[in-house]
């Protein structure tokens, strides 16, 4: 400078490297992979991954825990778009995978073991990241074998005059299976409702604003005891 005072020059250099290019291995399951697998809930997808042990306490929608490489279930960090969503209302911060259905999920990233270390100490056994990014193909889908087992999901995206990218995803899944009690007459079912809103706006070539809203509600039937079908 003109006065000869020492100063520090700060310059920016874009970092184009990604985690997997820095020696971190992750398994990516795309929307196309999910559709090809015929999966209904996230458990159907994760069962395809070696090294993940899935324990479900009943039919679809019941409490489900995942154990990775012999570690406790709460040692696996669960994220939504990079934000931790483990249930902190429980003692160990467990995540119930039985509540997760895949109709509004765009991609699943799985980091096993030390590959999840960059997420912090909560990811001792690894991390699972659910991505609900914008899908620019407007679709809707209805499927059902009968009135007791059916699903509906839709995706709609619009780019307005102010260059806002607005996206809505919604889904409803209903499944009624056989009774958990042998020779029982009551169907124990599950109903899942999901809404996902995404908004993106590019401020300039290197900066963008991104916001997401995700809501889910799962109700599952269960039997009170081995002789009582009401739960």
Regions from the PLM with identified roles:
Residues 1-35, 73:
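Short, acidic, small-residue-rich periplasmic hinge/interaction motif at the N-terminus
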Residues 37, 63, 95, 123-125, ...:
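Transmembrane beta-barrel architecture of outer-membrane proteins
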Residues 129, 136-138, 151, 155-231:
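Periplasmic-side early beta-strands and strand-to-turn transitions of outer-membrane beta-barrels
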Residues 26, 43, 47-84:
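Extracytoplasmic beta-strand/coil segments of soluble accessory domains associated
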Residues 65, 84-112:
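Short acidic/polar hinge/loop motifs at secondary-structure boundaries
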Residues 55, 95, 115-119, 141-143, ...:
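Outer-membrane beta-barrel domain signature
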Residues 58, 120-122, 142-153:
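Solvent-exposed loop/turn segments connecting transmembrane beta-strands
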Residues 99-139:
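A beta-strand signature from Gram-negative outer-membrane beta-barrel systems
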């Amino acid at each position: 400078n003109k006065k000869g005072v020492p100063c520090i020059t700060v310059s920016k250099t874009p970092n184009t490297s990604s985690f997997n290019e820095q020696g971190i291995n992750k398994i990516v399951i795309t929307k196309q992979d999910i559709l090809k697998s015929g999966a209904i809930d996230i458990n159907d997808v994760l069962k395809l991954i070696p090294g993940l042990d899935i324990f479900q306490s009943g039919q679809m929608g019941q409490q489900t825990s995942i154990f990775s490489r012999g570690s406790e279930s709460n040692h696996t960090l669960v994220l939504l778009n990079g934000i931790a969503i483990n249930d902190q209302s429980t003692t160990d911060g467990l995540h119930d995978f039985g509540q997760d259905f895949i109709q509004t999920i765009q991609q699943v990233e799985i980091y096993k073991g030390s590959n999840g270390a960059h997420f912090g100490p909560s990811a001792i056994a690894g991390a699972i990241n659910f991505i609900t990014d914008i899908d620019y193909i407007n679709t809707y889908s209805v499927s059902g074998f009968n009135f007791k087992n059916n699903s509906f999901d839709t995706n709609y995206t619009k780019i307005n005059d102010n260059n806002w990218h607005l996206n809505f995803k919604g889904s409803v899944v209903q499944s009624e299976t056989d009774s958990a009690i042998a020779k029982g007459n009551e169907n124990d079912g599950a109903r899942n409702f999901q809404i996902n809103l995404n908004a993106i706006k590019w401020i300039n070539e290197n900066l963008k604003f991104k916001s997401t809203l995700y809501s889910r509600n799962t109700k599952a039937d269960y039997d009170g005891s081995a002789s009582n079908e009401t739960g």
